[in-house]
From Swiss-Prot:
The lineage of its organism: Viruses, Varidnaviria, Bamfordvirae, Preplasmiviricota, Tectiliviricetes. Gene3D superfamilies: 6.20.10.20, Adenovirus pIV-related, attachment domain. Belongs to the adenoviridae fiber family. Coiled coil: none annotated. It comes from Human adenovirus D serotype 15. This is Fiber protein.
Amino acid sequence: MSKRLRVEDDFNPVYPYGYARNQNIPFLTPPFVSSDGFQNFPPGVLSLKLADPIAIANGNVSLKMGGGLTLQEGTGNLTVNTEPPLQLTNNRIGIALDAPFDVIGGKLTLLAGHGLSIITEETSPLPGLVNTLVVLTGKGLGTDTTDNGGSIRVRVGEGGGLSFNEAGDLVAFNKKEDMRTLWTTPDPSPNCKIIEDKDSKLTLILTKCGSQILGSVSLLVVKGKFSNINNTTNPNEADKQITVKLLFDANGVLKQGSTMDSSYWNYRSDNSNLSQPYKKAVGFMPSKTAYPKQTKPTNKEISQAKNKIVSNVYLGGKIDQPCVIIISFNEEADSDYSIVFYFKWYKTYENVQFDSSSFNFSYIAQE
């Protein structure tokens, strides 16, 4: 007759024997099971210890996969999805390269040919240009910054005779903006004050020809005593001469105090003048080296006559009505540069309008 063994009501036949199910047991794995990769969870159940990206999916050990990874059916291989220019080569991810890109020193770089360069700290101290691709420019070329970004430009020197026309073409002569000619226009309105305002009109054209200035001048008096010369009733010396002074500052700009109104004097634009007053015309001024201001007492080594041009014009264009013309350079003390026209006659004219013939002259330019 068998005898039934009496056991306690909370006896647990699952290892470890004799412990209640709800008891907190610090270590439950049998001695023949390693704790590496395994765990007792829930208590009393041997399970795998998982860490990302390993997971259990539908009772199977699985791998968590984000975007860009694919598990191939059949082979079970894990592959990487690529989009050009990325590619898989020999089980490695790479970049499909085409000119002008290359890999140098394990880094993606740009192959810069002639005329291009990548600025580094060693080649430029300007922080705004470091690590940027720039165009290398030589003589005659430069770069500009515009609202649309940088651009390459042709460098045109001031006073060099080159400019851009309205179409953007580089031209040696631009009649719309002729910086080689300063003038009053070919037929100006009355622009001078000999005795009273706007009583005469001076036609003056100065054209730069290298180191020389070619000039043309004529004077017509439209009102006042010189519009009808009568030396019988006006025989005084002052009634037989007219002076036209052009005074210029250090930039070659016509100053107040000149006989001519500065609003009539500018660079050429077709048969008129530029709309904006000019700011610099030193290249048209008489050379201070060739025509220095006169010193007192006079220096015998400096010519006292070189700064003058003396000749004749003819009133009304008639050879029997001569008038002496004297052009002096840089004689006026209250200006940096000056050109003065003296008209003087020695005959006694009666009822003759002062209307001089044109006179051409030249002088050495300041620069």
